Amino acid sequence: MFQSNQYDEYNKTNKSDEENESNENENENENENENRSEDGDQDSEDSFIYEEDDEEEEDTPKLSFGAKFLAKHGHIEGQGLGKEKDGRIDLIEVDRFQSTKGLGFAENDLPEFYRVTKHILEDEDVDFPSKQRFEWISCNSEGYNFWEGFPVDHTLVKFVANDSITDKPRRGHCSVELLMELDQHKNALDTLDPNRFYVARKKSNPYESIKGSIFINRAAVKMANIDKLADLLTPIIPVPGKPRDFIYFGDVCAGPGGFTEYVYWKKTRGGKIKGEEGLDLDDVVKGFGFTIKGQCDWNVEKFSKQIPIHNFVKEYGLDDTGNILKSENIRDFSSKVFYNTNGFGLQLFLADGGINTDGKESLQELMLQQLILCQILTMFETIGRGGNFVCKIFDTFTPFTIGLLYLVYQHFQSFSIVKPFTSRPLNSERYIICKNFLSYRPMNIIDFLHYINSLLNNNQTILELIEINSMDPNFLRYILESNELICLRQIKAFSLFKKYVEDIELPPIDQKEIRAKCLEEWGLPKETKYDIENYQKHKNRQKHHHNNHSNNNNNNNNSNNNNNNNNQHQHQHHQHQHHQNQHQNQYQHQNQHKKYNNNINNNSNNSSPNSSPNLTSSPNLNSPPNINNGNNHQNNNNNNSNNNNNNNNNNNNNNNNNNNNNNNNNNNKNRRFISTKLVKNNSQFQQKPPPPHRHMSPLQIQQQFLLQQQKEQQLLQQPQKDQLHQLHQQQSQSALPDFSAANFMEALLKRKNDSQQ
């Protein structure tokens, strides 16, 4: 695609450089003239030598870097390159616009019809409208009633030999001068370089940048242009039992399916079926396709993804080849259409058939005669009353083509021939558009056309179907005016094309503005097909990522809630065990206190009066506890070990949850179009378990010692009964073999004396 901005910038830079050079030359000339006028009165030798030096400098050209490099290596100007000095002498020209050809590419000379010259675009060359006008004609006489009683008579058909085909039949329905001028342009294309042809065609066609818009090919945009002119998708007679806007349509010889894609796109409003509740695609549109298998087959997979097309029916005829030139395939397709439409027929029939005629453009109309006949025959076989018809044709100069068009003209209420803007202006392509079919399966016409088709399949060449003199003068006048109008437009397009062939630096027309206006006029989006598909893919990826991200968040939140619940349950269990241990210790302490009271009472009865209550000593922290206290400590240690195990299990669960979260985060990081706001680690949302049991620190020991001293002071302040209880407790402890180190020797001596006595 050629952008006008690049050429505008290039021309601006060239113009600015040329203006700067011209200004510099003028300044230099003025300075030299001033110097010479000032020094003209002086006839000194210095001034004379200075002028001679200037002349010598002007005569000796400046050498370029390449010339200096070659001269340095012994190259002499005027001799060829290489060891034998028989190589290239001229410099290699740099082609800025055809850089893909490579250096040294020798382009073919232009044909005699073209000359390399510089051109300027005029106002007529740039005037290209976006709104198109055309003319309808109607048949005054009820021709379809005439053909209902018309017998098939092969005597009306004129035959000619195959070797006597000439272009003389063309001269009857167009100006000879226009045809001769048009033939000159077409014949010059035979010897034109293909690359130069394609470049000039793109630059000279102002509607080239429209291309296929959002559809599979240009045919869909042509259909959009035609539909804007004629409103063909609105049914004239509604189908019984269907909504008012529902249509049956047929698409013949239209692979890969541009017409079909547009019809489904337009009827479904861009892929969005709107209407009453429960409205299905079968209540909006249904299509039947017939095309030849192979390279021209349907390519439904490349249709726009947002367009529903699941009810489209593809047929290939009785022999499963899709060859429409065979009458048995046409009858098979017709029977299936009427079976699926309950005998109602099609409300829209589209035909876009064509063949390759490269190098044989002058014989294009003769080569397409049978194909056009079979498309019109299939239309008569399948279309219902009130249906519309669109068919692609080319030149309409021969009596055979004009006879076919006359049959169509007499069976429709409105008839027209249109060359849409989206059709390339250089070719002779055009479309016949017909509205409101006035008959229903005219069997005489159908049988007559089947008979003609059988003759063509037997290599019979037919010159004329209906005598020209018997046709409607209004129809013949319209054919003549249509041919001349299209010829004039073709000649105008070829004149602009010739300028771009002769001047490769001529900038193209601003195609962006024309494209935007045409798409707005035809009701098509300005974005391309790939832009919409890429946007839809990106949107689906974001939606898919959002769902995965929300699922991951839900899973993480659920796991966090489960972990928190587990931790809370475990913490509650730990507290419950701790309370149970405290209750057990209190219960054991109460029992022990009761025993002590009983012992004190017994000892008080048996004690001597000389005993003193001041014999009590402060408790020793290094003394071992009693047996009951040892059991209590064992229970506490067991409980602490259980709590440690529970805490370890909690930590393991937390580690597993953290690993799961890390895996989820890693999976999210590997995704495309991922949001940076990922779920944080679950560990910061978890409730921390209680700290495990540890050995007492020195500070804790000191605090416990102070607490015990306070308890001792409280005991000293108790009554005598409590002091006796403490004395009895010390005496019971002295019976044990384990004493403090300070009184150990004294206790041994006392026991020894007691044993001796």
Curated annotation (Swiss-Prot):
Protein name: Cap-specific mRNA (nucleoside-2'-O-)-methyltransferase 1
Gene Ontology annotations of biological process type: 7-methylguanosine mRNA capping; methylation; mRNA processing
Origin species: Dictyostelium discoideum
Entry keywords, A to Z: Methyltransferase, mRNA capping, mRNA processing, S-adenosyl-L-methionine, Transferase
Biased composition (Basic residues): 538-548, 570-581
Its biological purpose: S-adenosyl-L-methionine-dependent methyltransferase that mediates mRNA cap1 2'-O-ribose methylation to the 5'-cap structure of mRNAs. Methylates the ribose of the first nucleotide of a m(7)GpppG-capped mRNA to produce m(7)GpppNmp (cap1). Cap1 modification is linked to higher levels of translation.
Residue ranges constituting the G-patch domain according to the UniProt record: 62-108
Catalytic activity: a 5'-end (N(7)-methyl 5'-triphosphoguanosine)-ribonucleoside in mRNA + S-adenosyl-L-methionine = a 5'-end (N(7)-methyl 5'-triphosphoguanosine)-(2'-O-methyl-ribonucleoside) in mRNA + S-adenosyl-L-homocysteine + H(+)
SMART domains xrefs: G_patch
SUPFAM superfamilies in the cross-refs: S-adenosyl-L-methionine-dependent methyltransferases
Keyword Methyltransferase carried by entry: yes
Region named Disordered: 1-61, 538-670
Gene3D superfamilies for the chain: 3.40.50.12760
